[in-house]
């Protein structure tokens, strides 16, 4: 029990009303001690509310308001006796009539003393019954406040008025409709998902507000004080109540820790606090477990809890609408359409024919979703049916899964061309998908503690399936023209759907999730009618689902050998087509910021180049001489009308074969035309244009200037200052000691090519910096994003020799931060290394960049030099990461 000295004695012994401040501090310490000694969070928050009551009653009497006919009401969370350490103390002073001048003075004294105490955050309203009526009629917030107004002290005759006022000003329907619209708006503000990376545990879907919402609507109609009272009225079952109360306690407990850590009223479960709160719940990484295991398991519990709450919110409020609101509508006539012996459609929602359907016909569980998937006109599931379905889903066992009828029904759902995504989301939400595929249940709510994977694994998987389904819809053909065409000619689209369903299903188990997922998929495929050959293809897709994205991201796909090696791993067009569709859908389901026209162009180029290699024959070696001649001919055709062939060839003879192997004819013509027009002008040449293959958000910057030691470092430092993100870089040195550099950048603001003034600013900044090779612009200090400070990423540096190019390939993986590329470029410059090309990839908080370098003499580093350089680069990255974490 919580023992506190009576407030009156405490204040009397200190001879000062402000002693309430110290009293509350002492009480708060006792509450925390009680919590740490095992007292439940429910008892703690109620005790805190009661102690605040005691303080307010004391101050009420101190202001002589006990001699008035006014009433003091607790409202909001305080009205519900839900007080966390830094919760606001929301109160309402209510009067039956206009407030007298004497009482106004007393109220002023009361309010002043509240602020003088200094330990309260009061939110105060002073109203008459008439003003309550007027405000409640037009303000939903006021009406909601009145529903749970609780009389603390004062005129007991006023206790009945708050709810009476709401009954007078709002009908069941108007209040329900307004609260549901308010909830929809709140959901939209939180991305309509329970699984945000940094969820607001109070306001996001599945948060405390969803539980409050059930209470507000039920209290308005049933006139009850507690959700518990709804059990006796048949509105909620004892099981559902237990789930809600357990979830509510868990959310309160998180909020309790958030308040104490932030030392304020904080509802956002930020990265700043997730790991520490996880530890307070006992989720601590053990030896041998992944570094983020504890926090990921804690967040998994949170996401699952939020899913339970939002599902119950949906079901109970739909039940209220169907059983209370709709039947009372004027001229209401129930519309019923019989579907079959098991189901009917009632008011556009699917319902069972009788309450024993799922028990007597277990196949009806999956049949319900088959109907939903193929009837776009059905708006959802009736609440009574939903309640039966959730209970029935718990009875799905191995015998159920092994039933051929059930297996056929499941595959019919997967093959549905209409509402696959919505149907699978519903199957997951109501417990069917996780029970039918137990491995899927293991990834439900599983998050990856990073900024790259912004969805839980289960949500990502279903979004991937949604994307695949969209490839067959005409409205998305413009956005994904090539992949949509490829998808629509797949012989068996269900093969890629099953590969998608299982591609990440083994995450969180330990081991290689691709291999483990492939094993699960083979077992599933055999049971669900796929041939051995089809099962092998599904398994191959799962094992290699990252192959295409990693090749495009980390390798130079303008190199024919890279493309040939990739094509040989595929073997035929069937594997290429399936992998391409899976890869594009996967990237788009991982993080919306990850997919852009530059990345789309890389995927498209890799697909078309690999297709050409497969069609011409995998065994044929690359004929580089023919490739060079074909490229030169195509480029010359673009130039022939404007320049003499002799002038063109004069420029080209200064460039090596690699240039004509890796650059397209269009780019060669662009470069050549610019160089010829520039003539003998000693000033660096800088040109910008939209990337011809990547379109709107990717910009090509071409630089032609005398070669200099710090060319790359200077260029990326300037681009960083201009808020341009480098994605790709090629640096080619001609035999005349001139450098031809092409950078692909993403413009964060999207105005680089539409704002002439900004374009000119970028050009001038580059020309000025490159004209002063001895004046390196240096790093620009930028604000470090808050989230980055909470990720412990191991910096890695891997330096290998590319035998064919005789260049060192430097791969770095580090915590991404503003100015990283400029910092790395500066280090290369100081070490006397020339950069020939670079591939830049940012994956959430992680940067994975690749550079091809040589020494000044054009030779690669030897083993000893590699060792020394690797150590210096690693030390520099470690120093930068430490600065970020301490920022």
From Swiss-Prot:
Its cofactor is Mg(2+). GO terms for molecular function: [protein-PII] uridylyltransferase activity; phosphoric diester hydrolase activity. Residues 457-579 form the HD domain. Coiled coil: none annotated. Signal peptide: none annotated. Has four distinct domains: an N-terminal nucleotidyltransferase (NT) domain responsible for UTase activity, a central HD domain that encodes UR activity, and two C-terminal ACT domains that seem to have a role in glutamine sensing. It comes from the Bacteria. Residues 339-699 are annotated as: Uridylyl-removing. InterPro entries: ACT-like_dom_sf, ACT_dom, HD/PDEase_dom, HD_domain, NT_sf, PII_UdlTrfase/GS_AdlTrfase, Polymerase_NTP_transf_dom, UTase/UR. GO terms for biological process: regulation of nitrogen utilization. It comes from Acinetobacter baumannii (strain ACICU). It holds the Pfam family ACT. Keywords: Hydrolase, Magnesium, Multifunctional enzyme, Nucleotidyltransferase, Repeat, Transferase. This is Bifunctional uridylyltransferase/uridylyl-removing enzyme.
């Amino acid at each position: 029990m919580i023992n506190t000295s009576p407030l009156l004695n405490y204040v009397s012994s200190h001879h000062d009303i402000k002693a309430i401040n110290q009293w509350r501090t002492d009480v708060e310490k006792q509450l925390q001690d009680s919590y740490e000694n095992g007292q439940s969070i429910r008892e703690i928050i109620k005790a805190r509310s009661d102690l605040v009551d005691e303080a307010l009653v004391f101050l009420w009497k101190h202001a002589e308001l006990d001699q008035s006919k006014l009433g003091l009401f607790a409202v909001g969370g305080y009205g519900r006796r839900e007080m966390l350490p830094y919760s606001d103390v929301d109160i309402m002073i209510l009067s039956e009539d206009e407030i007298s001048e004497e009482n106004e003075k007393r109220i002023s004294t009361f309010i002043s003393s509240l602020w003088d105490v200094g330990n309260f955050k009061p939110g105060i309203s002073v109203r008459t019954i008439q003003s309550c009526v007027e405000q409640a009629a037009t303000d939903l917030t006021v009406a909601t406040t009145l529903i749970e107004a609780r009389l603390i002290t004062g005129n007991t005759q006023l206790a009945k008025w708050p709810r009476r006022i709401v009954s007078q000003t709002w009908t069941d329907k108007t209040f329900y409709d307004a609260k549901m619209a308010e909830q929809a708006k709140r959901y939209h503000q939180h991305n309509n998902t329970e699984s945000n990376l940094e969820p607001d545990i109070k306001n996001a879907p599945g948060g405390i507000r969803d539980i409050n919402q059930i209470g507000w609507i039920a209290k308005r109609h049933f006139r009850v004080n507690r959700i518990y009272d709804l059990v006796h009225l048949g509105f909620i079952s004892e099981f559902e109540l237990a789930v809600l109360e357990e979830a509510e306690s868990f959310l309160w407990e998180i909020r309790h820790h958030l308040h104490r850590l932030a030392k304020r009223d904080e509802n956002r479960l930020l990265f700043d606090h997730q790991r520490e709160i996880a530890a307070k719940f006992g989720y601590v990484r053990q030896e041998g477990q992944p570094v983020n295991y504890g926090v990921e398991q804690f967040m998994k519990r949170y996401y699952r809890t939020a899913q339970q709450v939002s599902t119950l919110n949906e079901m109970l409020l739909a039940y209220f609408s169907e059983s209370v609101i709709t039947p009372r509508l004027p001229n209401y006539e129930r519309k019923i359409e019989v579907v079959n012996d098991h189901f009917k459609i009632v008011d556009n929602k699917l319902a069972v024919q009788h309450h024993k359907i799922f028990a007597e016909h277990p196949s009806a569980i999956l049949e319900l979703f088959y109907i939903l998937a193929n009837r776009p006109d059905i708006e959802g599931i009736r609440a009574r049916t939903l309640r039966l379905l959730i209970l029935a889903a718990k009875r799905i066992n191995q015998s159920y899964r092994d039933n051929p009828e059930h297996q056929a029904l499941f595959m019919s759902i997967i093959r549905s061309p209409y509402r696959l995504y919505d149907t699978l989301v519903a199957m997951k939400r109501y417990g069917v998908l996780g029970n039918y595929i137990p491995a899927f249940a293991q990834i439900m709510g599983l998050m990856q503690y990073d900024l790259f994977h912004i969805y839980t694994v289960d949500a990502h998987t279903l979004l991937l399936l949604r994307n695949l389904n969209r490839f067959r819809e005409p409205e998305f053909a413009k956005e994904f023209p090539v992949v949509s065409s490829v998808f629509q000619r797949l012989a068996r689209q269900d093969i890629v759907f099953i590969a998608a369903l299982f591609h990440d299903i083994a995450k969180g188990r330990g081991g290689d999730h691709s291999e483990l997922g492939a094993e699960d998929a083979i077992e599933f495929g055999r049971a669900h009618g796929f041939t051995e050959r089809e099962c092998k293809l599904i398994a191959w897709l799962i094992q290699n689902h990252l192959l295409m994205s990693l090749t495009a991201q980390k390798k130079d796909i303008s190199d024919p050998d890279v493309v040939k090696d990739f094509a040989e791993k595929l073997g035929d067009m069937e594997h290429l087509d399936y992998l391409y569709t899976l890869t594009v859908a996967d990237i788009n389901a991982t993080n919306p910021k990850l997919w852009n026209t530059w990345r789309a162009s890389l995927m498209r180029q890799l697909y078309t180049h690999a297709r050409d290699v497969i069609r011409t024959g995998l065994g044929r070696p690359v004929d580089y001489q023919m490739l060079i001649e074909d490229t030169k001919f195509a480029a010359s055709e673009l130039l022939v009308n404007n320049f003499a062939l002799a002038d063109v060839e004069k420029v080209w003879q200064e460039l090596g074969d690699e240039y004509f192997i890796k650059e397209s004819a269009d780019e060669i013509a662009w470069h050549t035309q610019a160089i010829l027009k520039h003539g003998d002008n000693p000033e660096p040449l800088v040109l910008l244009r939209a990337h011809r293959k990547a379109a709107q958000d990717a910009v090509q910057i071409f630089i032609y200037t005398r070669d200099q030691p710090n060319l790359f470092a200077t260029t990326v430092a300037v681009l960083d200052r201009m808020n341009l993100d480098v994605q790709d870089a090629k640096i080619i040195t001609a035999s005349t000691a001139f450098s031809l550099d092409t950078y692909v950048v993403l413009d964060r603001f999207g105005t680089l090519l539409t704002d002439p003034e900004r374009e000119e600013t970028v050009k001038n900044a580059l020309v000025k910096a490159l004209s002063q090779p001895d004046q390196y612009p240096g790093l620009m200090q930028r604000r470090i994003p808050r989230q980055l400070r909470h990720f412990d990423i191991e910096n890695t540096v891997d330096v290998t020799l590319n035998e064919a190019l005789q260049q060192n390939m430097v791969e770095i993986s580090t915590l991404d931060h503003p100015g990283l590329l400029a910092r790395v470029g500066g280090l290369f410059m100081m070490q006397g290394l020339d950069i020939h090309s670079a591939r830049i990839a940012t994956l959430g908080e992680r940067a994975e960049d690749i550079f091809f370098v040589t020494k000044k003499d054009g030779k690669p580093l030897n083993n000893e030099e590699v060792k020394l350089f690797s150590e210096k680069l690693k030390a520099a990255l470690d120093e930068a990461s430490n600065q970020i974490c301490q920022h």
